[in-house]
């Protein structure tokens, strides 16, 4: 009698760590439970540099206007890059000019419409992150 072969465990990649800095998404209480991603939503980005460097986020989605008296997305993106953050930054303002400003401050890309955020996240969860 031949012993059955033990199933080989397939290594599972850890989920991508994703931060979303958007006051409206946070106010709506939106939650993103997407396979392959661990998503955290923040209402403002005042502490984004410390949060991103400590938590090791792979991807950061950054809005421009994050509420009265709060740091704006361009300032935060510039500070992230100056602090050595090497993850991807994606601008998610509904205003194309604001997205362009965030890109000029160091973001890698932008979403044309914030309404596409969930679809983009689903795609990101399915595809490996390119270096």
Residue ranges and their predicted role:
Residues 24-28, 65-69, 96-98:
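Short acidic, S/G/P-rich loop/turn micro-motifs used as interaction or catalytic elements
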Residues 71, 94-115, 119:
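Alpha4 helix (beta4-alpha4-beta5 surface) of REC/receiver domains from two-component response regulators
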Residues 1-34, 38, 115-131:
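Non-catalytic signal-transmission and effector/linker regions of two-component phosphorelay proteins
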Residues 53-55, 79-86, 105:
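Conserved phosphotransfer cores of two-component systems
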Residues 60-80:
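Conserved phosphotransfer microenvironments
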Residues 90-92:
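Hydrophobic/aromatic residues positioned on beta-strands within the core alpha/beta folds
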Residues 41-59, 63-67:
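Acidic, metal-coordinating helix/loop segments flanking the phosphotransfer/catalytic sites
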Residues 34-37, 85, 104-107:
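Short, structured coil segments at secondary-structure junctions
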